[in-house]
Amino acid sequence: MILSDGLIKELISYRALVIEPLSETQIQPSSVDLTLGSTFLAIDNINVPFLDPKRKETIKYREIHIEKGGQLILQPGFFLLGTTTERLMLPNFLVARVEGRSSLGRMGILIHATAGYVDPGFCGQITLEISNVNNIPVALYPGMRICQVSFELLFENCVIPYGLKGKYQGQEGPEGTRIFLDFLKE
């Protein structure tokens, strides 16, 4: 069951669901609009012939910070990691789904390549996988509404919430891949 605005507001009022900072105007009929943070990570591909998920040293990022009132011009075909301004704390009985906004999609901006699913128990800012599939540059502004998150109720609390084993738990700002940790478990 996807939560309605009334249920979202009720869970927030009891602090069972935390979204901070949050304005009442961000709450939509069945989702919450999230805004774009001011820090981004771009893959640094200098002297790296390819990215290898097994080798952490092949995956390096350079940080980009946009000052308040500034803009980021995202070039065609370019990919970077961004973050939401808001920090979420999900209870063990909710799953969140992050989706792009239609208005930005119509300009060629995608906000996630694959990671639109947020597990119960997650706490932190949402890292966005932003790309421009248009053939012209697009301006993005910190603080603008960049995506929306909806919430689905589980039939029962999960047994192992994300916080007990999640490699991105507590992330602040955009977080680069930690896929190399998967290979250490094998």
UniProtKB/Swiss-Prot annotation:
Its EC number is 3.5.4.30. GO terms for molecular function: dCTP deaminase (dUMP-forming) activity; dCTP deaminase activity; nucleotide binding. The lineage of its organism: Bacteria, Pseudomonadati, Coprothermobacterota, Coprothermobacteria, Coprothermobacterales. This is dCTP deaminase, dUMP-forming. InterPro entries: dCTP_deaminase, dUTPase-like_sf, dUTPase_trimeric. Belongs to the dCTP deaminase family. Homotrimer. Bifunctional enzyme that catalyzes both the deamination of dCTP to dUTP and the hydrolysis of dUTP to dUMP without releasing the toxic dUTP intermediate. Keywords: Hydrolase, Nucleotide metabolism, Nucleotide-binding. It comes from Coprothermobacter proteolyticus (strain ATCC 35245 / DSM 5265 / OCM 4 / BT).
